[in-house]
Amino acid sequence: MEGNFEEQNKLPELKLDAKQAQGFLSFYKTLPNDTRAVRFFDRKDYYTAHGENSVFIAKTYYHTTTALRQLGSGSNALSSVSISRNMFETIARDLLLERNDHTVELYEGSGSNWRLVKTGSPGNIGSFEDVLFANNEMQDTPVVVSIFPSFHDGRCVIGMAYVDLTRRVLGLAEFLDDSRFTNLESSLIALGAKECIFPAESGKSNECKSLYDSLERCAVMITERKKHEFKGRDLDSDLKRLVKGNIEPVRDLVSGFDLATPALGALLSFSELLSNEDNYGNFTIRRYDIGGFMRLDSAAMRALNVMESKTDANKNFSLFGLMNRTCTAGMGKRLLHMWLKQPLVDLNEIKTRLDIVQCFVEEAGLRQDLRQHLKRISDVERLLRSLERRRGGLQHIIKLYQSTIRLPFIKTAMQQYTGEFASLISERYLKKLEALSDQDHLGKFIDLVECSVDLDQLENGEYMISSSYDTKLASLKDQKELLEQQIHELHKKTAIELDLQVDKALKLDKAAQFGHVFRITKKEEPKIRKKLTTQFIVLETRKDGVKFTNTKLKKLGDQYQSVVDDYRSCQKELVDRVVETVTSFSEVFEDLAGLLSEMDVLLSFADLAASCPTPYCRPEITSSDAGDIVLEGSRHPCVEAQDWVNFIPNDCRLMRGKSWFQIVTGPNMGGKSTFIRQVGVIVLMAQVGSFVPCDKASISIRDCIFARVGAGDCQLRGVSTFMQEMLETASILKGASDKSLIIIDELGRGTSTYDGFGLAWAICEHLVQVKRAPTLFATHFHELTALAQANSEVSGNTVGVANFHVSAHIDTESRKLTMLYKVEPGACDQSFGIHVAEFANFPESVVALAREKAAELEDFSPSSMIINNEESGKRKSREDDPDEVSRGAERAHKFLKEFAAIPLDKMELKDSLQRVREMKDELEKDAADCHWLRQFL
């Protein structure tokens, strides 16, 4: 594989003479210094990059600096790297689609005369679409967001505008946010933002540090713009040109915002929408409702493996890869990408999607027919955009035509369905398809193509305007054919004069240099040499023969070339005219693309549900104010899809007042993390409108999923594992509501055992007593299981805390620990670690000491401060004074209660830490005369 890569991406030789090199060096020095810009120079057959860009490319993509060459000499030498066209596509895709830290510039020219012809950034890839998607589908829609924050009295109001250049949509929003910017983060995730426009001056304020962190968590490129660009001047006239339809509703919409309008002004300036007249009258504008979808932050997206990652071993590792099982066209894949970031909260719309999926699951014949027809549908959205940008031609129009003529087959398949959901299928798809394909819409487009394009030539791979479409073109075609006939007659006449066989001895060629010429082999040349020198003009003598002409052939050839040039020019004019006419159908094709892409995604959901070895079920969906989350026989869809896994299903019953808050304990690698994540994934799938991997499921709609799972070190940002845990947990404490779903895994590992336990206990109490959200809390702190007993004693509690554990079996004969991966009620046996050490043949002295120390710690465990001796089991006798133990335990319990009362969701992190330090200092003072309590400090 490496050999093939090297073969395809060989380093082209950098060929510049001294004069060209000097001219280029002079130009290169005039370029402004921009550390984010990666500049490429088109040298016709290959590209080059220079200076720091060349070093970056050599190290990042060639993985060696031996690829570098020096342009010039001495102190003026400039490091350079040459790049093949294949490699340029690879690099451009990585810079614009995968990374978020560079812009791309492409220059054309020679010597010292170069001009910038293309610029691109992660949020604005339009100029490079022909390169990025020449051999790959466009799976995501890049969105540029502009934000204008206002800080006042410790609060922040965000004005936000965004543009989706693929779907031609502008959006506005304005909302209050907390210090962790949870609303902004979930909005960026939902929109799929790749780049964020931000006022340069605002970035210098202390308040913006957390805002910048939020943007970085979402992998969004930050582009600072001068503050004077964030003004709403001339917005009315700009929007009047851009937005389709009546301007009055647009004015009413925009007038309702204070901060979003400056953000929109900067966005229009940055995206240069007004510089392209093709955009005029083609955009829609809408209010973006941050509560319109389930909120997902970057931590939840990462924890639930929603989107694909470069590290995935196969596509089934991510939810997108799994559910993108049979999406055929790029527009369907892009819609799925968007849906997974925007799960629904509208009960009726969720049920409608589920009805359609159920229809497709139950009607295998309908599903297969529709899938076969959709396979022949092209990416309508991309074809349309290429035509609108005048980068497409007849080939794009033909693909639209071939897609359009498949619609009657799709309609027929739907008309034949008479099942339970026939009326829904008719309303949702059939009637809309009939309206779109009538004679006033796509019927007219089909007529246009059939009368303007020579469809017979498609078999030869030629895309041409039909000569019958235009009288001038028809006349030129007749002239061309007449001249072709005259040239062939001259060919025959000349063969008779020279006594040579037509096409065997005397051939008629068309050369790029000479036009129409006669050719004979060198063997035949001596036979006609005398006539050749007196009656003809010899043009070229080579091994393949002698090329010659005469005045008649040259005259006819020149006339023929002139007519061909006129014919091509007329063809081009007519193609441009047809393309312009086709773009008038943009709105119809946009509606068609939306219809077909939705059908494509829901068919993919049905294919997944029907093809899985263990069936999926349709979830019962209830409102967020009622019902529980009950999953019977639930499975993790991505884990069970791996070839090497025999998945053990588990039940999960998050029930109000009984088990709304679940503490899950058990040995490492026992399945705790998989279990709690699969619940989050299943809820997300259900609210997207998919069947779920369960035997039976009932789900109360959630407005948000929060996940704190497996934080890693972020040293490059100066953030430790523990700090990352705390930051993510702070987002949960501030942003969660009783309608959210919370998933927390192994909180408190990055600090001391007692600090970690104290934090875990306090966070649990806060979530139970204040947030009251359904929560799955996997932990290695077995003492937390006492929370269930403590919570049951609180009067008026409606949450319900329950203990669950993942089970394991120790075989005393084989000395093997077997994970059973079953989640069962109750707390976990805490002795697995020492058993495993014993069976691993640890020295007996080490095992004995471990048991002794474990017993000591059990005496001093935090649970002894919470529940009585009878409930916590028998304790080893100890020498501490009972009064001292009682006094110390009471003080420790007071500390934990005070800690739990801290309003973490309303305090800045530094203030919270300061308050904890003060409490700890007070505790240490009180412990000075208590030996038992000092053992914990």
Curated annotation (Swiss-Prot):
An example molecular function term from Gene Ontology annotations: ATP-dependent DNA damage sensor activity
CDD domains: ABC_MSH2_euk (cd03285)
Residues annotated as binding ATP: 666-673
Matches recorded under InterPro entries: DNA_mismatch_repair_Msh2, DNA_mismatch_repair_MutS-lik_N, DNA_mismatch_repair_MutS_C, DNA_mismatch_repair_MutS_clamp, DNA_mismatch_repair_MutS_core, DNA_mismatch_repair_MutS_N, DNA_mismatch_repair_MutS_sf, DNA_mmatch_repair_MutS_con_dom
Pfam family name, one: MutS_I
Extent of Polar residues compositional bias: 861-870
Annotated keywords: ATP-binding, DNA damage, DNA repair, DNA-binding, Nucleotide-binding, Nucleus
Domain of life: Eukaryota
Keyword Transferase included in the entry's annotation: no
Disulfide bonds: none
SMART domains registered for this protein in UniProt: MUTSac (SM00534), MUTSd (SM00533)
Effect of residue 404 to A: In strain: cv. Landsberg erecta
GO biological-process terms attached to the record: mismatch repair; negative regulation of reciprocal meiotic recombination; pyrimidine dimer repair
Function: Component of the post-replicative DNA mismatch repair system (MMR). Forms three different heterodimers: MutS alpha (MSH2-MSH6 heterodimer), MutS beta (MSH2-MSH3 heterodimer) and MutS gamma (MSH2-MSH7 heterodimer) which binds to DNA mismatches thereby initiating DNA repair. MutS alpha and MutS beta recognize single base mismatches and trinucleotide insertion-deletion loops (IDL) in the DNA. MutS gamma recognizes specifically the T/G single base mismatch. Plays a role in DNA homologous recombination repair and has a broad range of anti-recombination effects.
Family: Belongs to the DNA mismatch repair MutS family.
Assembly mode: Heterodimer consisting of MSH2-MSH6 (MutS alpha), MSH2-MSH3 (MutS beta) and MSH2-MSH7 (MutS gamma).
The name this protein goes by in its record: DNA mismatch repair protein MSH2
Organism: Arabidopsis thaliana (Mouse-ear cress)
